[in-house]
């Protein structure tokens, strides 16, 4: 079945071991982010087998895929009030930045006779989620501490995701200072794979004890400079797609070029007549910009919603292999994206 993704669990396991060794030297525990692979249970199990005690996802439906695994389960996107009951049912921990949502979670936790842990998010300048004003954070902390159904687990922040503001020592110290000031320092989550560079430079202060890592544990890559970490593999996920047309055509389109379906005006270089192929795969399946060919002599020219155009500079078979730096649609933002059920998965190792 094509397209398909070959997933090497041994390489994922080794990447996890490398990252755990790095973070443990800095007294930091990992929450393994599973949205990259849609919460696929076998991959989640691989992370747990390597000693990852916490798994997190932005979607409850993904967390339910591995609800029976022996690990703490985090919802790492703020809950909707309408899903408060499900959050308490299936998640041990959730990140929060709205008082009304905390009240809804507390109500559901009391009804279900459970204690739900909450991490309050602090906006340190990326301007996505989190409390920006300290007085609002203090109000939420006071509520969480007295709420019968909630347990204030700690504080967290998120950087390099919206405005791409980078993590630095000053921001980490501010987060740590707030956690100490309000006695909310059981878990202080200092960010995602974009914080690894700061950790490697010994810039994370003692007391920041958690990072939420997906890209680095799966692909061995830190997010700030997009550099691969020594000892990791970047080919744990390989996608294969079938060629549905192979012809010689001009490399420069004929006629006036307009914007594509995504609002971008493509740029082409005239290289004369070239051998090229179309694969049965497109942007609704994969993030084309985060893939690159395995086969020598093949280049990715571009893609539309359902077609991937490659230059066949050298001879290759009818199957094109590409490395994927995310697997939601087999690639970057969710290794298994919108058409996850139209793509076959083949596992090797562990």
Label every PLM stretch briefly.
Residues 1-7:
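Generic N-terminal amphipathic, Lys/Arg-enriched alpha-helix
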Residues 19-27, 144-151, 178-186, 248:
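A structural motif corresponding to the C-terminal end of an alpha-helix
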Residues 15-24, 46, 62-65, 181:
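A short, N-terminal amphipathic alpha-helix
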Residues 6, 28-177:
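Active-site-proximal beta-alpha core segment in soluble small-molecule metabolic enzymes
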Residues 15-16, 34-37, 55-59, 79-84, ...:
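A broad, low-specificity signal for short, low-complexity segments enriched in glycine/proline
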């Amino acid at each position: 079945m094509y397209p398909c993704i070959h997933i090497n669990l041994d390489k994922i396991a080794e990447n996890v071991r490398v990252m755990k060794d790095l973070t443990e030297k800095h007294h930091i525990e990992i929450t393994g982010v599973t949205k990259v692979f849609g919460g696929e249970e076998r991959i989640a199990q691989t992370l747990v087998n390597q000693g990852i005690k916490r798994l997190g996802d932005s979607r409850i439906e993904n967390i339910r895929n591995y609800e029976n695994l022996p690990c703490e389960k985090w919802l790492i996107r703020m809950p909707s009030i309408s899903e408060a009951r499900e959050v308490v049912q299936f998640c041990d921990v959730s990140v929060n930045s709205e008082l009304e949502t905390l009240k809804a979670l507390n109500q559901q936790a009391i009804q279900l006779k459970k204690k739900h842990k909450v991490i309050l998010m602090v906006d340190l300048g990326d301007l996505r989620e989190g409390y920006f004003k300290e007085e609002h954070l203090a109000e939420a902390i006071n509520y969480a501490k007295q709420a019968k159904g909630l347990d204030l687990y700690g504080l967290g922040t998120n950087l390099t995701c919206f405005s791409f503001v980078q993590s630095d020592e000053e921001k980490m110290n501010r987060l740590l200072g707030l956690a100490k000031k309000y006695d909310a320092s059981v878990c202080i989550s200092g960010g995602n794979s974009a914080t690894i560079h700061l950790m490697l430079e010994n810039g994370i202060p003692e007391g920041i004890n958690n990072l939420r890592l997906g890209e680095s544990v799966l692909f061995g890559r830190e997010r700030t400079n997009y550099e691969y970490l020594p000892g990791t593999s970047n080919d744990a996920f390989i996608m294969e797609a079938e060629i549905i047309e192979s012809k010689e055509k001009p490399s420069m389109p004929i006629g006036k070029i307009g914007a594509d379906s995504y609002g971008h005006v493509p740029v082409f270089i005239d290289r004369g007549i070239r051998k090229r192929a179309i694969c049965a795969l497109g942007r609704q399946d994969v993030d084309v910009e985060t893939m690159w060919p395995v086969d020598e002599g093949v280049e990715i020219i571009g893609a539309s919603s359902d077609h991937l155009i490659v230059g066949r500079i050298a001879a290759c078979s009818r199957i094109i292999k590409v490395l994927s730096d995310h697997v939601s649609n087999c690639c970057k933002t969710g290794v298994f994206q919108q058409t996850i059920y139209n793509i076959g998965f083949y596992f090797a190792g562990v």
